[in-house]
Curated annotation (Swiss-Prot):
A family per Pfam: GASA
Keywords, alphabetical: Disulfide bond, Gibberellin signaling pathway, Secreted, Signal
Gene label: GASA4
Induction remarks: By gibberellins.
Organism lineage string: Eukaryota, Viridiplantae, Streptophyta, Embryophyta, Tracheophyta
Family listed: Belongs to the GASA family.
Functional description taken from the UniProt entry: Gibberellin-regulated protein involved in the regulation of floral meristem and floral organ identity, and promotion of seed size and weight. May play a role in the promotion of gibberellin responses such as regulation of flowering under short-day conditions, seed germination and inhibition of gibberellin oxidase. Possesses redox activity in E.coli and may function in redox regulation in planta.
Cell compartment(s), UniProt: Secreted
PTM comment, free text: Six disulfide bonds may be present.
Main location: secreted
Knockout or disruption consequences: Increased number of axillary inflorescence shoots and decreased seed weight.
Name recorded for this polypeptide: Gibberellin-regulated protein 4
Length: 106
């Protein structure tokens, strides 16, 4: 009898952890960035250096990141939020590719 209560308790605990994980995963994927603040044309050329400093602050390849970020920002007039990813917010930044098809903008 004690073993069955223990098994039911353990099963209930596992189900609760799975539900909690599902809720956290679904709420984290709904992050939406403001197109006005980060979308194409949201910056002036004079704002590019400070936005690229923010974007490249935590990268290992700081000098290369700054160079390419500034180049992309001057063309697209936007820099995605955060330190990595989120390129879908700035379509020009996301779609500009190298000759090999890799991303041009960090």
């Amino acid at each position: 009898m004690a073993k069955s209560y223990g098994a039911i308790f353990l099963l209930t605990l596992i189900v609760l952890f799975m539900l909690q994980t599902m809720v956290m995963a679904s709420s984290g994927s709904n992050v939406k960035w403001s197109q006005k603040r980060y979308g194409p044309g949201s910056l002036k050329r004079t704002q590019c250096p400070s936005e690229c400093d923010r974007r490249c602050k935590k990268t290992q390849y700081h000098k290369a990141c700054i160079t390419f970020c500034n180049k992309c920002c001057r063309k697209c007039l936007c820099v995605p939020p955060g330190y990595y990813g989120n390129k879908q917010v700035c379509s020009c930044y996301n779609n500009w590719k190298t000759q090999e098809g890799g991303p041009k903008c960090p």
